[in-house]
């Protein structure tokens, strides 16, 4: 399983630490990650994978709820869907 996680919100200390910890807790591996701060806004994109099959609906709920605790918006989607949506 391969997926794309995006995180957007007002910048503050601990976002990367919190999100990467949650990723590990859910049994996902970070294959690639990038983040930047634009003005006062934090953005991050991570490519994650798992050898195990994952329930995307459950992962989405977990990340959405966790994002609320960090005051950021976290989205996860299958890399195949992400690629299809962003194919030029």
Curated annotation (Swiss-Prot):
Cystine connections: none
Cited Pfam families: ACT_6
Spans traversing the lipid bilayer: none
Alphabetized SUPFAM superfamilies for the sequence: ACT-like
Top-level taxonomic group: Bacteria
InterPro entries listed in its UniProt record: ACT-like_dom_sf, ACT_dom, UPF0237/GcvR_regulator, UPF0237_ACT
Domain ACT: start-end pairs: 4-77
Known partners and oligomeric status: Homodimer.
HAMAP family: UPF0237 (MF_01054)
PANTHER family membership: UPF0237 PROTEIN MJ1558
UniProt family annotation: Belongs to the UPF0237 family.
The name this protein goes by in its record: UPF0237 protein SMU_72
Organism: Streptococcus mutans serotype c (strain ATCC 700610 / UA159)
Lineage: Bacteria, Bacillati, Bacillota, Bacilli, Lactobacillales
């Amino acid at each position: 399983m391969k997926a794309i996680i995006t995180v957007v919100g007002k910048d503050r200390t601990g976002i990367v630490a919190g999100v990467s910890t949650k990723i590990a807790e859910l049994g996902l591996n970070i294959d690639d990650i990038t983040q930047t701060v634009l003005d006062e806004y934090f953005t991050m994109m991570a490519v994650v994978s798992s050898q195990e099959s994952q329930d995307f609906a459950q992962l989405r709920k977990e990340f959405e709820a966790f994002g609320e605790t960090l005051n950021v918006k976290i989205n996860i989607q299958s890399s195949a869907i992400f690629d299809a949506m962003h194919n030029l």
